[in-house]
């Protein structure tokens, strides 16, 4: 997969995406990430990328022309037309289902907003999907772009050592992850649940499922109501 990030602060994205699992995935060729400086596509001698908004109002808006130039150059470099995403507080909130959907693309362009946003016409012209990471406002779209890239990259074959690594994590199957423990088995009077120490894999699997349901019911009742439960689980958790 190739992900192109169009931003005013490419170093901000590169510094994070060169580290840890994503950095190794890039080094091994499982993922290609290209960060593009939007000012390189700016207008005039001063490479201008923003202007005042029509109709008045405070703040500056990213212009359509530089963004379009960046998009066109990236599109020319890819065999399959990229799916284009704009990180925006008014977009659909990113969740694991959307991450799975995005991971099916061969190429993705991620546009990072700044100032008061971007000219609406460029979003319409390129059929851009708007995605948010939550109901709050950030200074720019760089951190959301990194979050999206990280989440999508983890779904790609070879990025993680084993498929089970992400299949058992929170949100992958719609539930939150069960509690986990490591050595020592006793710490400050708190014991690791005995079932995890007996080596009985079926019992461990059942315990983890029960704990995952309990955690989800308590912390995210909205997710719990959507989860697929067996008849036995419905009775145990009082769900119809």
Kindly label every feature range from the protein language model:
Residues 1, 184-240:
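SAM-dependent methyltransferases
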Residues 35-56:
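Short, surface-exposed acidic-centric catalytic microdomains
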Residues 4-6, 34-36, 85, 108-109, ...:
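Hydrophobic/aromatic beta-strand patches that form the interior of the parallel beta-sheet core
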Residues 63-114, 119, 157:
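S-adenosyl-L-methionine/SAH cofactor-binding core of RNA-modifying enzymes
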Residues 118, 122-169:
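Structured adenosyl-cofactor binding patch, chiefly the S-adenosyl-L-methionine
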Residues 143, 155-194:
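Internal, active-site/partner-interface "lid" segment
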């Amino acid at each position: 997969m190739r992900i192109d990030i169009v931003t005013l602060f490419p170093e901000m994205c590169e510094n994070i995406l060169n580290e840890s699992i994503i950095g190794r995935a890039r080094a091994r060729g499982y993922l290609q990430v290209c960060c593009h400086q939007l000012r390189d596509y700016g207008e005039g001698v001063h490479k201008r990328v923003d202007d005042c908004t029509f109709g008045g109002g405070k703040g500056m808006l990213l212009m359509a022309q530089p963004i379009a130039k960046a998009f066109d150059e990236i599109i020319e470099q890819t065999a399959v037309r990229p799916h284009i995403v704009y990180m925006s507080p008014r977009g659909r909130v990113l969740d694991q289902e959307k991450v799975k959907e995005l991971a099916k693309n061969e190429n993705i362009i991620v546009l990072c907003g700044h100032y008061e946003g971007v000219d609406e016409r460029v979003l319409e012209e390129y059929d851009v999907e708007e995605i948010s990471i939550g109901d709050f406002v950030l200074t720019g779209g760089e951190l959301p772009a990194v979050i999206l890239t990280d989440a999508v990259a983890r779904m790609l074959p070879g990025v993680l050592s084993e498929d089970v690594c992400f299949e058992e994590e929170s949100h992958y199957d719609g539930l939150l992850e069960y509690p986990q423990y490591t050595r020592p088995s006793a710490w400050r009077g708190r014991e690791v649940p005995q079932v995890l120490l007996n080596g009985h894999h079926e019992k461990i699997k059942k315990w983890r499922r029960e704990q995952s349901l309990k955690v989800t019911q308590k912390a995210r009742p909205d997710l719990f109501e959507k989860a697929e439960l067996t008849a036995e689980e419905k009775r145990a958790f009082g769900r119809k």
